Design a protein with these regions (language model features):
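Exposed beta-strand and adjacent loop surfaces of beta-rich binding modules
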Residues: 279, 295-299, 350, 421, ...
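Substrate-binding clefts and catalytic carboxylate motifs of secreted carbohydrate-active enzymes
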Residues: 123, 173-339, 345, 588-624
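Beta-strand/loop-rich accessory regions of lumenal/periplasmic or secreted enzymes
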Residues: 344-346, 375-669
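Substrate-binding/catalytic cleft of secreted carbohydrate-active enzymes
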Residues: 49-259
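Extracellular interdomain linker/stem segments of modular secreted and single-pass surface proteins
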Residues: 10-17, 372-376, 520
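N-terminal carbohydrate-binding accessory modules
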Residues: 1-58, 78
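Terminal connector regions
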Residues: 2-4, 315, 342-382
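Extracellular/periplasmic ectodomains of large secreted or surface enzymes and adhesion receptors
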Residues: 237-238, 244, 250-251, 255-259, ...
Length: 669
């Protein structure tokens, strides 16, 4: 006698037109991802261990749903049943439907195999036109007891609009402007470094304004690049056809992995700024489906982040920690969390909060600077021992061919015709940081007749004056060899000298100053700011404040499969406090003295297999200090994305103090 054991579960699943999907009587919003069955070595052949790994990664991203283009391995459905992940089970049909001879057999086999999996909440007939209408009645026929809802993915069909890759304002009489339940079964296409978590919150927040929003599925879980034995064992994603994942082919975590995890965390924190008035309380929102927040817990840690000028205490050291009292609030409610500020709170540099679910698993962590960049700089400089005392005061000299600021250890030379750095010598070694400042996203013209040098008690000074977007850039070299830069930008409505008001881009993607520095000289970077992943304007969530380090790499997201090192080295880094560019010959450190600076470190290479460029344009220089950066997107252009993806615009009124870009450079060897 043959027998088979099958584990089943009991739950109710209901669909109500113009209302939503209800699981056990509670309205469900799916936070989902599309997943292909894939392994590097086995292609479409996977294992129970891989299914477990993938399901756990889905849960770690705070997702609760999965869809694919065909019935998955049963062991993956078993994992979904076990972990509480809901599933949209689809009859294969990628844009071409089965005929009426083969199709009925496949519908019957799929439903009879999968019917007892409680994770399955919706059936799907084909994909993007790949359905046969004659098969539709068969889903209810074979799912005779539960009669789960059936959809045509990408279509507005059967009272559920599943439109693929909607724009932010989709659409006329549909989605947020319509009167049908909507659930995009593909959106935020994560090709290369695009999509995924970039811009996710804009779309999600907009859709959540409509009670008929039932969730959606990001495309796609992992890059599909099988090992090609016929091509020497390379991993091949077929150029741009399959590098679509938020994780790599071996499940390497990309930046979007963490961005999604943060934006879909079931516990959300309202915007928080640590000031002198902070008393340890802040607002939290419960975005769980069922769980009251009193079943969860949260901890806090106070960390120190020292500068390279002071090594008295290891960066990242925890000087205080404890528990946060969470409010007893039901799903959908907002309440106040609180903790008692430890006596050492103001001695720290970063507040870290971490939330744990009812099973004790970490669901998200958030970080907040206890001091903003200028406060941090002043505080740390006041505590820094007075090392490397100067023998002679710094001097400023000007000739017809050069402007020179010179101290005992560092000499900085400027071109008097352009106002740009032409040479830096430190300890007898040339530091190849030069050819700047060059304006990014704006126009400025150096005015040599208005510029001047002077010697002061605070060091050697060179004041470079400009027409256009910049008013002045003051360089000051201290006796100890520290180089200060104070730039005043956009403080006048008319740039003068023929510029009038046409001295900035009408759409601001990048705005700031850039310099050149040879990439070959750089071996790594250590910095304080958001990290460890690079950011885009619409993908800052998922990065945290701290001191980070990464060695140089040339990873091309979704393509460098033979040497896939994450986080990527090149790109934009948010909220820089300080950064050390490591080099065997010419390391140096930059300190930010104002807030919100994006640090552009070299320009990532475009994927060779791309159909078109995948990233917005970077500044022309190698190293940039920016007050605004561009967003990234896929499929739809930027103007069809959400508000946090849009380029900035500049308005200047008489009396504005302008924008400041204040830095300090330590070139001392």
């Amino acid at each position: 006698m043959q027998s088979r054991e099958t584990r089943i579960g009991f739950r109710t699943i209901e669909f109500f037109p113009q209302d939503g999907v209800y699981l056990n009587g509670t309205k469900l919003v799916v936070k989902g991802v599309n997943r292909h069955s894939f392994s590097v070595d086995g292609g479409r052949a996977t294992s129970a261990a891989m299914s477990r790994q993938d399901a756990l990664l889905v849960k770690e991203m705070n997702m609760n749903a999965v869809r694919s283009h065909y019935p998955p391995d049963e062991h993956f459905l078993d994992m979904c049943d076990s972990l509480g992940i809901v599933y949209m089970d689809e009859l294969a049909g990628w844009q071409n439907g089965y005929d009426s001879k083969v199709g009925p057999k496949l519908v019957k086999e799929m439903i009879e195999r999968d019917v007892n999996h409680p994770s399955i909440i919706i059936w799907s007939n084909g994909n993007e036109g790949g359905w046969n209408y004659n098969l539709d009645p068969l889903f209810a026929k074979y799912d005779k007891l539960q009669k789960r809802h059936m959809v045509h993915p990408w279509a507005d069909f059967n009272d559920l609009d599943t439109h693929h890759y909607p724009t932010y304002l989709t659409g006329v009489a549909r989605f947020t402007n319509g009167y049908k339940v909507f659930m995009p079964t593909e959106f935020m296409h994560a090709m290369y470094d695009q999509g995924g978590g970039a811009g996710l919150r804009d779309f999600w927040d907009r859709w959540c304004t409509n009670p008929m929003f039932a969730g959606g599925f990001i495309w796609v879980f992992c890059d599909e690049a099988p090992k090609r034995s016929d091509k020497g064992g390379i991993l091949d994603s077929d150029k741009s056809n399959a590098p679509d994942g938020v994780v790599g082919p071996r499940r390497e975590k990309e930046g979007s992995y963490y961005a999604i995890r943060a934006q879909w965390s079931p516990i959300q924190l309202k915007p928080l700024l640590i000031t002198d008035h902070f008393d340890g309380s802040f607002l939290v929102t419960n975005e769980y489906t069922y769980t009251n927040l009193d079943k969860c817990r949260m901890t806090y840690k106070i960390r120190t982040c020292e500068t390279p000028l002071k090594n008295a205490m290891e960066s990242g050291k925890v000087i205080a920690e404890g528990h946060v009292q969470l409010p007893a609030i039901a799903p959908g409610e907002t309440g106040k969390a609180r903790f008692t500020l430890p006596a050492s709170f103001r001695e720290g540099d970063v507040l870290e909060l971490e939330a744990f679910d009812k099973e004790g698993k970490s669901i998200c962590n958030w970080t907040y600077p206890i001091r903003l960049a200028k406060q941090y700089f002043d505080h740390k400089m006041a505590q820094t021992p007075m090392t490397l005392e100067a023998v002679q005061p710094a001097t400023a000299t000007q000739t017809a061919t050069s402007i020179e600021l010179k101290s005992d250890r560092v000499t900085v030379t400027f071109d008097p015709a352009t106002g740009m750095i032409s040479r830096i010598i430190s300890g007898g070694t040339e530091v190849p940081f030069k050819d700047g400042p060059v304006a990014v996203g704006m126009k400025m013209r150096y005015e040599p007749t208005l510029s001047y040098v002077r010697n002061s008690n605070e060091g050697a000074v060179y004041c470079a004056k400009y027409k256009g977007a910049a008013d002045s850039i003051v360089w000051r070299l201290t006796d100890k060899g520290l180089l200060y830069m104070d730039a005043i930008l956009l403080n006048r409505a008319s740039g003068g000298g023929g510029f009038d008001d046409a001295f900035m881009d009408s759409k601001v993607f990048n705005l700031g100053l850039t310099f050149s520095y040879p990439e070959k000289n750089c071996s790594g970077m250590k910095w304080m700011g958001r990290g460890p992943y690079r950011v885009w304007k619409n993908r800052i969530p998922g990065t945290n404040y701290g001191v980070w380090h990464k060695e140089y790499n040339n990873t091309i997201t979704g393509e460098s499969f033979e040497n896939l090192v994450y986080p990527e080295f090149k790109g934009y880094h948010a909220n820089m406090y300080w950064a050390t560019l490591e080099s065997d010959t010419t390391p140096f450190t930059i300190y930010s003295r104002n807030d919100g600076i994006f640090f552009h470190v070299f320009t990532p290479e475009e994927p060779k297999g791309r159909v078109k460029d995948t990233m917005p344009k970077f500044p022309e220089g190698d190293i940039s200090f920016l007050l605004d950066i561009p967003a990234i997107c896929s499929f739809k252009p930027i103007e069809q994305q959400g508000p946090n993806s849009q380029p900035g615009n500049i308005r200047i009124k008489s009396g504005d103090e302008g924008l400041h870009l204040n830095l300090m450079f330590d070139f001392r060897q």
